[in-house]
């Protein structure tokens, strides 16, 4: 699949340290002259339930199996949130970095799940 480099619908997804949920924004970008214009077509936050929030809070203490399960479950939650926001429409690109478990740039370490 090739993306039109002058016109694209892009879905951005993130989950931050606030642990409030999965943030999504579907934007239509189009080139206008030398720059870009965009329109936000839809945006929402899908809240985490209490159990997922607790798992994310404790993730730095998790063992390998627990992290693997969290990675899978957050990935499913992100995919479901994307599907629900798009409601059968298409996006040219979905940009997601998952949820950051820890980030220690001074040591060159970061870990995202999902």
For each predicted feature, which ranges?
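Short acidic/glycine-rich loops and adjacent helix/strand connectors
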Residues: 1-114
